[in-house]
């Protein structure tokens, strides 16, 4: 594991919670502290592979600068959404992107309070505009999209993808985050992340199980782990959930849930940035402590179905020194086509980020400079 001092790291969630004071700070930061990164060339030549990936950049909260980049067979196109939709912006603080089917991609744009829909060629076609403070998404591949929302004490919205209208909702725990669909049920990880601001509830440690058809909460699974924050990773019936802890005396953990049996196992390391590939969960953990003022990063692999955990990124160990050298690791992804690993570096959280590409053995192939801030989610086309 490796450490980062407090003064160079600030998570997107912490920025989001700073309220009105943060708006002023972000504007000052954007005006005064942006590094002159736009003219920096990519570090290596394009790599010939079969990957065609979208890279979602959150942007800065309140700055309306979320963006989408296309990495097509090793060739990077920045501001791809704006290129395909002249005069349009993606919005403010994009949290998630999901390919619903062969013709439709959904993007959750949190502070714009919309779910934006685009075709695989990038052209915008519609939006759902009445889900405030939307976060993460899942689909049943049967014509419905499910979106978590921090609003109204926490709920899940069900969208009919034919009409793009919300047709039902279900209240779950406070500040629901990650969501997954399995066998007619939704599994929703609740964080309770606003607890330190609102003072009316604590951190959540439950997974809500929701009937996707009736949109009624069936039961709650108590994981015993606080603050189930972040995007979940799914491999068939297995779900990997990060539990961030309280950043004081309760350390972070990882919860792996078998959605078929609803049994789970807890691991004593975080999985802040996690992906599923080749029957494994690959976990890049980021643990912040208010007591030390430092972030601790770690890498682990969880094999399925044995649930055996090991340190490092199995098969990609050669990539670990590069990831350890990143200023602010922010996303991890393995292509289902090429088995290439991609990792992003948000750097100072207010500058253009980098994406690193590694071979199936972890050899560094490319470093791409994005024209976007906080690259957080990849999706393969």
Describe every region a protein language model picked out.
Residues 28-31:
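C-terminal motif of bacterial Sec signal peptides marking the signal peptidase cleavage site
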Residues 33-381:
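Predominantly soluble domains enriched in secretory-pathway, periplasmic, or organellar proteins
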Residues 2-21:
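Bacterial N-terminal signal peptides that target proteins for export
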Residues 21-22, 48:
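A generic structural signal for short, non-catalytic loop/turn and secondary-structure boundary residues
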């Amino acid at each position: 594991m490796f450490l980062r001092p407090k003064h160079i790291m600030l998570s997107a969630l912490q920025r989001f919670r700073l309220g009105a004071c943060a708006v002023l700070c972000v504007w000052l930061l954007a005006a005064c502290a942006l590094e002159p990164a736009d003219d920096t060339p990519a570090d290596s030549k394009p790599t010939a592979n079969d990957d065609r990936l979208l890279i979602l950049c959150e942007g800065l909260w309140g700055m309306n600068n979320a963006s989408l980049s296309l990495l097509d067979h090793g060739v990077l196109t920045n501001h791809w959404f704006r290129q395909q939709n002249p005069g349009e912006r993606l919005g403010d603080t994009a949290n998630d992107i999901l390919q619903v089917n062969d013709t439709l991609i959904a993007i959750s744009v949190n502070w714009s309070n919309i779910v934006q829909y685009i075709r695989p060629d990038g052209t915008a076609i519609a939006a759902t505009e009445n889900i405030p403070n939307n976060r993460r998404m899942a689909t049943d591949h049967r014509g419905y999209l499910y979106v978590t929302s921090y609003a109204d004490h926490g709920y899940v919205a069900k969208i009919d993808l034919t009409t793009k209208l919300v047709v039902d909702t279900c209240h779950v725990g406070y500040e629901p985050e990650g969501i997954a669909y399995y066998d007619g049920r939704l599994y929703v990880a609740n964080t309770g992340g606003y607890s330190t601001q609102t003072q009316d509830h604590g951190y959540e440690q439950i997974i809500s199980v929701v009937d996707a058809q009736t949109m009624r909460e069936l039961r709650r699974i108590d994981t015993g782990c606080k603050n189930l924050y972040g995007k979940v990773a799914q491999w068939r019936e297995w779900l990997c959930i990060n539990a961030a802890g309280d950043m004081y005396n309760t350390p972070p953990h990882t919860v792996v849930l078998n959605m078929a049996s609803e049994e789970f196992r807890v691991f004593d390391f975080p999985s802040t940035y996690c992906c599923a590939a080749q029957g494994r969960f690959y976990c890049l953990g980021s643990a912040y402590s208010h007591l030390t003022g430092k972030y601790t990063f770690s890498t682990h692999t969880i094999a399925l179905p044995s649930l055996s955990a090991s340190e490092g990124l199995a098969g990609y160990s050669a990539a670990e020194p590069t990831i350890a050298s990143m200023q602010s690791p922010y996303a991890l992804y393995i292509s289902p086509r090429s088995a290439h690993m991609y990792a992003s570096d948000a750097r100072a959280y207010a500058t253009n980020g980098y994406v690193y590409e590694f071979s199936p053995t972890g050899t560094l192939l490319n470093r791409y400079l994005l024209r976007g801030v906080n690259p957080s989610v990849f999706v393969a086309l």
